[in-house]
Amino acid sequence: MVANGHFASNGEGQDSGSYEHGVQVIDEDKEFNPNVSRYLTYENVTPAGFNYHLISVFGSQSTGKSTLLNHLFGTHFSVMSETERRQTTKGIWLSKNKRVESSKDRDPQMKMADNILVMDVEGTDGRERGEDQDFERKSALFALATSEVLIVNIWEHQVGLYQGANMGLLKTVFEVNLELFLKDNKSTPRSLLFFVIRDFVGTTPLQNLQNTLLQDLNRIWSSLSKPAGLENSTINDYFDFAFAGLPHKNFQPEKFVDEVQKLSTRFRNAHRDPNNVDSRGTGSIEGGIFLPEYHRRIPADGFAVYAEGVWDQIVNNKDLDLPTQQELLAQFRCDEISREALVAFDEAISPFESKQAEAVQAGSPQVLGGLGPVMRNARMNAVKNFDAEASRYHKRVYQMKKSELEEKIDTRLKALFLGQLNAAHRSGVQDFSESVSAAVKAGQKRGASYDFAEIVSRERQLAIEKFEKEARSTLVEDAPWSNYQQELSLYQKDLERISGQLRRDEMRRLATRVERWVRSRLGESVDLEFNALGSGRGGSGAPEFGDKPSENTIWDRVWTIFVDTVLDAERRFTERASSFDASLDEVDVGLWRLRRKSWGVLRAKIEEEVMEGNLLLKLRENFEDKFRYDDAGVPRIWRPTDDIESVYTQARESTLTLIPLLARFRLAETNAPPPLDKWIGHTPSSATPADEEDLTPIGGVDEDEGKSLEEEMTMIGEAKKQDLIVRFKKTADGVYVEAKRSAIGGITQVPLYFYGLLLALGWNEIMAVLRNPAYFFLLFVCAIGAYVTYQLNLWGPIIKMTEAASHQALEEGKRRLRDFLEASDTGRQAMAMSGARNATEEHEMSNLNRKSGERGGQKYRGEDVADDDDVDDDF
């Protein structure tokens, strides 16, 4: 026996050199070699898919099977030594076709098929195993389950014999074939039995030998016990047959080599010729011997796993179910391929998953740039790689595993997709809100009117386009979850919600501006009306044109001013609200709130006017105007002969009538409160609790308030009214006393003896004046001037003019003195020292005055001034 050290037997070290000539698939102890897949990888057969062919050789021990394979396929199987007659091939060995063909000696169409794998099966009828035929049966079953072509190696002189022609082995092959067919009832697997007749001398024609073998095979087939339904089946239903003869290797070596060369050309792909139909009704085989129907349809990368599973079933004496084995292989390989595909998928997707998870955990989801292309490429590559490897396996299993892979991939991609849309949703809503607010502020800064509805519509369209662009860029075509319509609908609803909120906020800001405008206008107008109460005369207190307004109709005028102002505000509010695309319900609620707020403004203003201090001041002014001035508005100069008591009583009683008049808001025309409840109207049905929470309850309007309209219109209570009457009377009494004192003051001011003393002491001067015509005339003129001045009541203006002239003269003197002092050095130094001292004192006094002013005026600067400055120019 020639032993070759470049075969990898079961259990040997697995270096690359050990696979040079082949691998032992099953050893003599019936153990399967787990390194078969490594050998196929070493020979680069694994990537071939279905583009490979498997041949097994059968025959009696020591009949030259290995020698035939070595010459035919260039393999290096161990062969028997010429000097010994014993078993050389133990178990089953596998090697790839190593035959080197010369292009100049071979037609390219006659080239051997690619990736031919040859299995050298242990010979039968050997003395080493004796009567133990278990391995023969198991190896035959294994070869038939895996191989396309079964080469039967026999000698010419054995044709016609039973044992010598391996008819016993062939009977075993036929039996296990039927066994396999029973399990695979969906198809009829076919194989090729290739009889190679050795030491063929040609005396008996090859056709006769072929006929003899076919007769023996048919006889064996007929003798088999067939399962139900297959009683009439023939051997040709499962097998095709081919025959070849080879000369004696030792006696005709050159011819043997030539015939082997010719025989090798038959090991190529074949097809059936439909124009040349055989006895079975199928086309004859043309070309080579490898028909597609012989192939077991096991991809090369799964052959090792499949073969191991088949052998495990065989060696454990279990029923061999090839379809089940193919499905198990498909499941195993598809799972492996799926895991490999997911590795590359993980490398591409995991970074984005981590970024998205971190952003969500931080509470600020962010849109991941470049996610869409990565998702599409990762999914496409994973499915493509899976299809390339797994599509060659069992179709049902392949489809099932592909669906599982796509489900795993799509589950993760869908999570990324939804996370991306969620981030785009949040950022889009935020950007939309900020953009609308920025556009509104820009319009307010420009001072021009802006269309809020147009701003919202434009920004909303931009936000939707941005969201759809991001969603489309993240879509994965053909994925079942690649539909963002639901998310888009939710996004649009959120934009609508935000738009509504922004519109309501803008409506509230508009209402606030209108309220400020109403407050400003009402404040001015009501101030004028109440200030008119401070003038009881028809002169300075009366309007510039027309008569003095009647005090009894003050509430009518206030109500008219109020209604006109609010109607104007409503018109402005409605015009501005139309640019917000506000609904009728929102406008109704806004107008209803405006009327209620405006009434609150008016009532607050009235309460301010009728405060005790303000009202007493106006009552005093009203009384003084009526008491100190006549009906023409001319000041009264009280004389002792005037009826001061009558004028005082009339003025006081007239002023006292204002207190009950101002105590209640009543219209003079109806002597009833104004129809405030009808004017404000009922609460709109669309009003929400939020619309009412900041409103002040109004008596007679709000039923839950428990206060009537009459009570709402009461501005001064009874106790306060009595107090005002008492205090006013005291004030009026003081004015009366002052007037009375001034009337009698001219008489009692100069004593009578003073005139006698003046006459006695000034007699000489009096006589000198009377005797001198010039002095007398001057005295006469002065007396006439004094009388006229007195009658015209011009002494006051003359005194004031005199004081002003003297003050101006004093200032002019100071200025001239200052100029004089500045002309000398001594004067300048004195002025500098005096100026520094005065500046220090003025600074201290200024600080005191400022602090006092800040405490007293802070409230008005924070309220009245701010309100006036904030009033929108549009209103």
UniProtKB/Swiss-Prot annotation:
Main localization category: endoplasmic reticulum
Cellular component GO terms held in the UniProt record: endoplasmic reticulum membrane
Gene Ontology terms, MF aspect: GTP binding; GTPase activity
All copies of domain GB1/RHD3-type G, residue ranges: 49-307
InterPro entries from the UniProt entry: G_GB1_RHD3_dom (IPR030386), P-loop_NTPase (IPR027417), RHD3/Sey1 (IPR008803), Sey1/RHD3-like_3HB (IPR046758)
Species in which this protein is naturally found: Blastomyces gilchristii (strain SLH14081) (Blastomyces dermatitidis)
Listed name of the protein: Protein SEY1
Lumenal side: 771-773
EC number(s) stated in the UniProt entry for this protein: 3.6.5.-
Acidic residues composition-biased segments: 690-704, 865-875
Residues covered by region (Disordered): 676-704, 831-875
Enzyme class: hydrolase
Keywords for the protein's UniProt record, in alphabetical order: Coiled coil, Endoplasmic reticulum, GTP-binding, Hydrolase, Membrane, Nucleotide-binding, Transmembrane, Transmembrane helix
